Amino acid sequence: MFEARLVQGSVLKRVLEALKDLITEACWDLGSGGISLQSMDSSHVSLVQLTLRSEGFDTYRCDRNIAMGVNLNSMSKILKCAGNEDIITLRAEDNADTLALVFEAPNQEKVSDYEMKLMDLDVEQLGIPEQEYSCVVKMPSAEFARICRDLSHIGDAVVISCAKDGVKFSANGELGNGNIKLSQTSNVDKEEEAVTIEMNEPVQLTFALRYLNFFTKATPLSPTVTLSMSADVPLVVEYKIADMGHLKYYLAPKIEDQQEGS
């Protein structure tokens, strides 16, 4: 049997909002250590990896490993029925073909329960190699979302150039071009407002803005975002989920002088 209770149910709502536009269905792997999900998007360009550790839940029980095929759009629709303050409990029997979702109002005066049909999914797990990155940029997540949104009005790809003193985002299009440069902040009162750069060697890579704008749907999950880059390997865009885990997106760089991203 599986049962997980989350007093801060809004976290789960935000996770689904961050996933549903990029991937339509995915296998949730439930185990004693927590919940994980790994999936390519439908066009096989980007990869999503989610970890929610068991200790981040208020109660968590998973007697044996379960692979649960979920239509993310359906789950998102059901979670929209939960209030932001609601306590959310997920429950499934070992060989169940449904997932129960229970929403309790904080005052205990209203309890809603839903059952969602599960899917049979044939999923191949991709190994994600551990990697040292040439540049790691940590910045406010809302700032990154704004940059991606603004530059997508200019062009459909962004060049991210990372050097010791700052990181530059550039786009070219029919109307002209745009450049946004962020300098490393030296002293900021609030850590989440800082821009920090760890650089082993400078990097300049091009990425499709369409996908970055999908990734920034995760902005409400975390005040900061971390971008990890190296030549010829996928960019990692990571949002920490406080006390629980993380949501990571991987996107391969576009090869220069080619129309199609590889």
Swiss-Prot record:
The entry's keywords: DNA replication, DNA-binding, Isopeptide bond, Nucleus, Ubl conjugation
Cross-link position per record: Glycyl lysine isopeptide (Lys-Gly) (interchain with G-Cter in ubiquitin): K164
Gene Ontology molecular function: any one: DNA polymerase processivity factor activity
Post-translational modifications reported in the UniProt record: Monoubiquitinated by the UBE2B-RAD18 complex on Lys-164. Monoubiquitination at Lys-164 also takes place in undamaged proliferating cells, and is mediated by the DCX(DTL) complex, leading to enhance PCNA-dependent translesion DNA synthesis.
InterPro entries: DNA_clamp_sf, Pr_cel_nuc_antig, Pr_cel_nuc_antig_C, Pr_cel_nuc_antig_CS, Pr_cel_nuc_antig_N
Subcellular location field: Nucleus
Name of a matching Pfam family: PCNA_C
Subunit structure and binding partners: Homotrimer. Forms a complex with activator 1 heteropentamer in the presence of ATP. Interacts with DNMT1. Interacts with CHAF1A. Component of the replisome complex.
HAMAP family tied to this protein: DNApol_clamp_arch (MF_00317)
Role, per record: This protein is an auxiliary protein of DNA polymerase delta and is involved in the control of eukaryotic DNA replication by increasing the polymerase's processibility during elongation of the leading strand.
Family note: Belongs to the PCNA family.
PANTHER family membership: PROLIFERATING CELL NUCLEAR ANTIGEN
Protein name per Swiss-Prot or TrEMBL: Proliferating cell nuclear antigen
Species per Swiss-Prot/TrEMBL record: Gallus gallus (Chicken)
